[in-house]
């Protein structure tokens, strides 16, 4: 069941909160045994290594998650692109953003990232606390559960992500979208309205 991935994910971020980065990476390892959880393992391995200051290892782990065609999610692009930018690899960031645009030609969301690159201003680190890391885990689970099972479970995990990280536009959109599909329009609109005006969303 869900414990197969929830226990390693949340256990890892609890250990990050306690300052035990090596223990956190070890806690993720059960995810690497199951092919279905490999992308989740690589993503959170990258996030934890990035927080620990191991940028090169983090980039390697992120890059594993985008090897397959069609694997380029918006969140992955944000996370890896941001790290490329903050480590002086602007050309790789630009190539990644352009790849996303070629795969999603109607999306306007890479415009601000490309403009920021031109200005040379580095983005803020997207995950700076264990709580924000756990929010990434909840968001990922919500997204995954929504595609495979019920909206209710997706809504619960999405709400948990927002409890841990209230200003999380992709999670706000996901939860609002679920509410809208359930015809809870007022709550959906409130959530859409709460998205930071400075966000490209």
Regions found by a protein language model. Give the residues of each.
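Short, structured interface segments
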Residues: 107-122
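Generic helix N-cap/helix-start motif at coil->alpha-helix transitions
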Residues: 2-10, 34-44, 69-78, 90-92, ...
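Amphipathic alpha-helices of TPR/Sel1-like and other helical repeat/solenoid scaffolds
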Residues: 153-163, 192
């Amino acid at each position: 069941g869900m414990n197969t991935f929830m226990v390693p994910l949340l256990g890892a971020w609890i250990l990050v909160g306690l300052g035990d980065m090596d223990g956190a990476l070890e806690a993720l390892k059960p995810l690497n045994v199951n092919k279905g959880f490999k992308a989740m393992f690589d993503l959170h391995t990258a996030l934890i290594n990035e927080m620990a200051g191991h940028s090169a290892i983090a980039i390697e782990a992120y890059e594993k998650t985008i090897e397959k065609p069609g694997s380029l999610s918006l969140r992955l692009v944000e996370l890896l692109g941001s790290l490329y930018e903050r480590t002086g690899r602007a050309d790789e960031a630009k190539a990644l953003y352009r790849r996303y645009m070629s795969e999603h030609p109607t999306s306007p969301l890479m415009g601000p990232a490309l403009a920021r690159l031109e200005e040379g201003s580095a983005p803020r680190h997207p995950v700076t606390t264990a709580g924000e890391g756990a929010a990434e885990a909840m968001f990922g689970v919500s997204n995954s559960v929504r595609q495979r099972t019920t909206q209710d479970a997706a809504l619960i995990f999405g709400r948990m992500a927002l409890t841990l990280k209230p200003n999380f536009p992709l999670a706000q959109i996901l939860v609002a979208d679920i509410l809208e599909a359930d015809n809870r329009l007022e709550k959906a609109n409130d959530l859409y309205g709460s998205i930071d005006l400075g966000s490209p969303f």
